Amino acid sequence: MSSGIILLIVAIVLLVIIAYLVGVIIRKRNDSLITSLEERKQALFALPVNDEIEEVKSLHLIGQSQTSFREWNQKWVDLTVNSFADIENHIFEAENLNDTFNFIRAKHEINSVESQLNLVEEDIASIREALNILKEQEEKNSARVTHALDLYEKLQASISENEDNFGSTMPEIDKQMKNIETEFSQFVALNSSGDPVEASEVLDRAEEHTIALGQITEQIPAIVAKLEDDFPDQLDDLETGYRRLLEENYHFPEKNIEARFQEIRESIRANSSELVTLDLDRAREENTHIQERIDSLYEVFEREIAAYKVAAKNSKMLPRYLEHVKRNNEQLKDEIARLSRKYILSETESLTVKAFEKDIKEIEDSTLAVAEQFGLQEKPFSELQVTFERSIKTLTNVESGQMDVFAAVKDIEKIESQARHNLDVYVTQLHMIKRYMEKRHLPGIPQDFLSAFFTTSSQLEALMDELSRGRINIEAVSRLSEVATVAIANLEDLTYQVVQNATLTEQLLQYSNRYRSFEAGVQSSFEHALRLFEVENDYQASFDEISYALETVEPGVTDRFVNSYEKTREHIRF
């Protein structure tokens, strides 16, 4: 053979080998793809869809939920019966084509199977999601229904256990319970007939009515307890207490107490009858009004009981207190009468004592007998309490006034004695002041001093005359004694001032001799001051004149003389 033919044969053999190898590789790859598709198919088929369907099926769906479930269940049946079988056929066909090296048709079958698996996978996911939604929705609805039924059953049990606490409202409560029961029946019927929207609305109403009735039944026992137990018990207590108080001779300003008892009982009956409408706000408001009327009766009784304690105590105290104040007044009258024989007293004391006597007489006439016969009175104790307290307050004021009058008159004799003592002292002081001035050997006595001296002397004489009367005007004595005290003190101060001015003027006049010869101002002031001193006896003006002149030539000289004088000044010896 020629080399060309050999090369051709070799080339053909190589091509066949290469083609075979390529075919083997493609076949293995397709086998791998087919195996993968088979595994995907098995994985999808192995999903627990059947279990989930059975689980939802066991919920006994009704209405729209049941219809939806049937549709999804049928879709799953179609998938398992048709889609999976068709996929299986295509996989088998792809295997045969691949084994016979019909790779193009095998690839087409593989792609077809893959597309079908994708669709099936999506459908299964939708089915499972729908089943889960149905399950959750049914569980939710079931829980809602269960919750509503539980509320109803608990309410029913609570009402049955506490039936005695609902009083006249029980028929209306039974009626409301039957209405709720009817609503639950409507819900079941609508739900079964495939009308879930209206069924849900009915269930909502049933639940709302159950909750509302539950809230009402929680509040009713307290209202009923007030009407059937608390109020009647309080009224019985009040009526029993009222009868007992009447037996103990209590009287009341309020004359309609029996009628008020009856009105309250009628209000209790009326509110109990109206309660069947379950208008709890109105019932509570009426209960509040009833309680207020009951409380007002308690307050009436408690007021009189408290008033009795106070009035009984005051009825015992008042006669003793009245006697004490009356005795004080008699003693005060006697004391004023005694003092009036010697003293002219202010009319205020006598008039005040007469006013006290009038107050005492009024209490004797109007209140004393009532207090002494306290146990036989037919007046409310609250009125007696006011009467006694008013009288005791009047007696307290009278006693306080008596003490004031007594304080005003008890020192009259002391005032006289003190005034006489002061008069003796002031007369002696007046003589000592006169002797003190005489010993000074002054050129003359200043007119202002003489005026003060004789005025003081006249005031002492006036006091002496008042004390010498047959009946002493004690107010005048007190006033004149005070005036004399001030006058003698002022005269003493004036005496010291006159003597000081005169003494210092003499000293300064003598001291001015050292300046007179060469200070014309000092000489002029000396002459003027000397005339004021010796002729006019105006020692103050004379001192001012000479001291001013000396200060101009020797500042501080006046203070030096004044300080020296004050250290050695002679005092009046009283």
Swiss-Prot record:
It is found in: Cell membrane. Residues 27-574 are cytoplasmic. Residues 102-141, 274-350, 459-520 form a coiled coil. Residues 1-7 are extracellular. Its main location: membrane. It comes from the Bacteria. One of its GO terms (biological process) is septin ring assembly. InterPro entries: EzrA (IPR010379). Keywords: Cell cycle, Cell division, Cell membrane, Coiled coil, Membrane, Septation, Transmembrane, Transmembrane helix. The keyword Coiled coil applies. The chain crosses the membrane at residues 8-26. It is a single-pass membrane protein. GO terms for cellular component: plasma membrane; septin ring. It holds the Pfam family EzrA. HAMAP family: EzrA. Negative regulator of FtsZ ring formation; modulates the frequency and position of FtsZ ring formation. Inhibits FtsZ ring formation at polar sites. Interacts either with FtsZ or with one of its binding partners to promote depolymerization. Belongs to the EzrA family. This is Septation ring formation regulator EzrA. It comes from Streptococcus pyogenes serotype M1. The lineage of its organism: Bacteria, Bacillati, Bacillota, Bacilli, Lactobacillales. The gene is ezrA.
